[in-house]
Amino acid sequence: LQQALDKRGMILNLMYFYQGQDEVFENVDAIRRAVVNATDWLIENNARNVIIEIANEHDIRGWDHDRWIHDNMDKLIELARARFQEKNAGWVLPIGASTGGSMRVFDHVRDHSDLTMIHGNNRTPEEKRSRTAELFADPKMPGPIYMNEDDSGRETTLEVLARELASCDAVFSEGGSWGYMPWRQTQMFPFRHYMPAKTSKLEPGMTLEQSD
């Protein structure tokens, strides 16, 4: 995937940890090793088109290990960054971590990140606009303001599409970048792939296979 994206001039947002899978790690030493191993793989494969997201929604409920990943995010960011120097890479990838719909940025993450990562889930377009403007104007916030996930509704309808487009416009207008999350395609298992419909226009009454 990383190589295919690179050939198309695209960037991979690579998430190391999520609360739904962190139970596979036996202890915090295993978490540290995961950061080292994943980052070393990126370096060894010259994967320069990557943003490292140490943890996705590190502030929400559900994390195991007594929320160790959230509490030690600064150390994990620096651990990943140190691998580039240790390996004499001569280059480094941007590193950060995202919060959920709180759109909050924690000090111990902010002070060690290369960019500011938030989610707009279940927020109105105006709330997203306002928060993006606040972050963009704050000189303490690192790098780009990157809303890399936004859940504006879980059905493929015109109403949800309108909220998605309004959210994109709101974030863009205040200097942020916006990430579309097609919930039905990314959050369901097993993964389902539908061929394109006969028209690119979303219309009421379409079957699920056509609208998705």
Which stretches of residues belong to each language-model region?
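Extracellular glycoside hydrolase catalytic/binding regions
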Residues: R33-A34, T39, N49-E209
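An active-site-proximal structural segment forming one wall of the substrate-binding cleft
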Residues: L1-E53, L76
